[in-house]
Amino acid sequence: MTKQNSPLVLGTEPIGKLLTQYAIPAIIAMTASSLYNMADSIFIGHGVGALAISGLALTFPLMNLAAAFGSLVGVGASTLVAVKLGQKDYEGANKVLGNVLILNVVLGVAFTIAFLFLLDPVLYFFGASENTISYARDYMRIILYGNVVTHMYLGLNAVLRSSGFPRMAMYATLASVVINCALNPLFIFGFGWGIKGSAWATVISQVISLTGQLIHFSRPKQLLHFKRGIYRLRSEIVKGILSIGLSPFLMNLCSCLIVILINRGLKEHGGDMAIGA
């Protein structure tokens, strides 16, 4: 681990330099993340059709809700990790890392089970019709199957950033976006999987990025790494994560509600095609 990549530089390097080192990768990663849905829409529109784009748009509120739970754990955990590292409590920081894994699995599985059973009623509430429900259902089911991966990917990326590896977090995001863009045309046009192909492209791209994150945290030479004794959920850590992550969770929840209202309004006044416009 080089000095530049060490989390210890957070307490020694000039603040201006640290702001640049952390802000620029974060901006690039956030910009790249916005290309996810854009890429899916472009390939689905050309390969499946206009109604499929409307079906995709109907899944956005549910995907925003999944991201809200991801930020609940990710933001809270990244803040706690930074605090523990600042206190030189490296064992405590590792315990936070272990709790991130378990919390993401628990929340991801619960979210998946709940919405797999309620998927059709939820999509109809979001504004689906008989013309668009099949597209939205096909896409969202696959996304839900990979929901635990999404939660883990978002959570570990936040911890990567707060533990002194902002560039690695950026590369994980960029890799996911690039792989998604490469697999979309292959699965939609090459294999003829339709909207399901786009969903599989999203899940597989996140699996690959998550694999890189897991490899990083599996190395004993890293200050933060997987090891025995860190995976038991501890009430003080869980409370800290949830209390800190509550604000970004509520912000994402509001974003989810806004998209629902917009979609329902578009359906009422413009029909199915307006939702995908």
Identify the function of each model-found stretch.
Residues 10-47, 61-76, 80, 105-112, ...:
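N-terminal transmembrane alpha-helices
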Residues 21-40, 142, 176, 205-209, ...:
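Transmembrane helical elements of multi-pass membrane transporters/channels
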Residues 104, 159-182, 196, 200-203:
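Alpha-helical transmembrane segments of multi-pass membrane transporters/permeases
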Residues 35-38, 47-50, 84-87, 162-163, ...:
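Helix-loop interface residues and adjacent transmembrane-helix termini in multi-pass membrane transporters
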Residues 53-113, 150-169, 263, 275-277:
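Small-residue-rich hydrophobic transmembrane alpha-helices
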Residues 1-23, 81-148, 190-245:
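Short alpha-helical transmembrane segments in multi-pass integral membrane proteins
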Residues 65-68, 180-184, 210-214:
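Hydrophobic transmembrane alpha-helices of multi-pass small-molecule transporters
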Residues 44-64, 131-135, 195-196, 237-244, ...:
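Interfacial/gating helices of multi-pass transporter permease domains
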